[in-house]
Amino acid sequence: MTGLTMGSLFDGIGGFPLAAIRHGITPVWASEIEAFPIDVTKHHFPGMVHVGDITKLNGAKLPPVQIVCGGSPCQDLSVAGARAGLSGERSGLFMEQIRIVKEMRAADMARGRTGIDVRPRWMCWENVPGAFSSGNPKYEDFRIVLEEIMRVCIPDARMPGPNPGEGWPDAGMLLKEEYAFSLAWRCLDAQFWGLAQRRKRIFLLADFASLYAPLLLFDALDELEDKGEEEQKCTSATNTDS
C-alpha cells in the first residue's frame, strides 16, 4: 500500500478509482451526477463517498486528498462536436476542477501545512486529443489548461501558445524549479493498454511540490506500457490456441 488518497471528479463509472486501488491508492470520494454510473461505483467501491454535483462543491470542505483526478466533459473539445471549447457549458467545467483544487490547498495551508504536505499535491486531467487544437484562436484551449494549472501555485503564471503553425506536441512538460512545480502531458492510445480499439486520450499530471511529474508520466508509465504489451501478447496467444 502506498498510503496515498485520491478524489475523482467527473467520475463516470470509476475509471480513476479502479486504477487507484490497483496501485494501492485509496479512492476517498467521487463527484458524479448521473444515477447509473453512481450505482456502478457504489457497488465496486462501497467505501468511496459520493459528494454530488461538482458545481456545488467547496474544495475546502471536502476530505483532503493527495491526488485529485478528473476527465472534464469532452463534448465541446472533441473534433466530432461543435467545438465550443472551454467556453462551452460542458467542457468549461474544467475550471470547476481548478477551483476545487485551489480551495482544498488553501484550506490545508490555513491549517499550517506547507510544501509536499499541502493537499492535493498532484492533479491529473484526462481529455480527448481535440483539446490540443480547440479554441479561438486555434490551440488556445490547451494553452488555457496549462496556464490555469500553473496558477494553482503560481498565481501570475503566463503560458505562451505553441509555435506558429505547429500546434501542441503529443507530449511535453513544464518545469518551474523556483516554485517546485512541474507538469507533464502525453497522448496515450488505449490499444496499447489492453483495449481492442484505437482510443487516444491526453493525460496530464501536475506536481505542485516537486519536479517529479515528467518522471511519473513518462518513465513510470513506459514500464507499465511494456508490461501491458506483454500481457496483451500472452492473451492473444491464449486466444489463438483456444
Residue ranges and their predicted role:
Residues 2-6:
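Extreme N-terminal starter segment of soluble prokaryotic enzymes
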Residues 8-14:
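Class I SAM-dependent methyltransferase "Motif I" SAM/SAH-binding loop
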Residues 15, 19-26, 44:
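A short, Lys/Arg-enriched amphipathic alpha-helix followed by its capping loop at the start of a domain
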Residues 30-31:
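The conserved SAM/SAH-binding core of class I Rossmann-like methyltransferase domains
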Residues 34-35:
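Conserved SAM/SAH-binding beta-strand->alpha-helix loop
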Residues 39-49:
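Short, conserved SAM-binding/catalytic segment
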Residues 57-65, 77-242:
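Class I S-adenosyl-L-methionine
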Residues 65-71:
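Short SAM/SAH-binding signature in class I
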